[in-house]
From Swiss-Prot:
EC number: 3.6.5.-
Protein name: Tubulin alpha chain
EC class name: hydrolase
Chief location: cytoplasm
Family per similarity comment: Belongs to the tubulin family.
UniProt-listed InterPro entries: Tub_FtsZ_C (IPR008280), Tubulin (IPR000217), Tubulin_C (IPR023123)
CC cofactor: Mg(2+)
Assembly behavior: Dimer of alpha and beta chains. A typical microtubule is a hollow water-filled tube with an outer diameter of 25 nm and an inner diameter of 15 nM. Alpha-beta heterodimers associate head-to-tail to form protofilaments running lengthwise along the microtubule wall with the beta-tubulin subunit facing the microtubule plus end conferring a structural polarity. Microtubules usually have 13 protofilaments but different protofilament numbers can be found in some organisms and specialized cells.
Subcellular location: Cytoplasm, Cytoskeleton
Native organism: Blepharisma japonicum
Length: 50
């Protein structure tokens, strides 16, 4: 499929850059999900200690 986009004027480097950007975005979402799950776990455990 890349050759179609290159034929329309895109550069191949743009695909690599987009792939890296998506990988970074996915990693950010995973980190936020982990932090959110940890924060929810702390909130649930807070009331049990009293």
């Amino acid at each position: 499929f890349v050759h179609w986009y290159v034929g329309e004027g895109m550069e191949e480097g743009e695909f690599s850059e987009a792939r890296e950007d998506l990988a970074a975005l996915e990693k950010d979402y995973e980190e936020v999900g982990i932090e959110t799950a940890e924060a929810e776990g702390e909130e649930e455990g807070y009331g049990e200690e009293l």
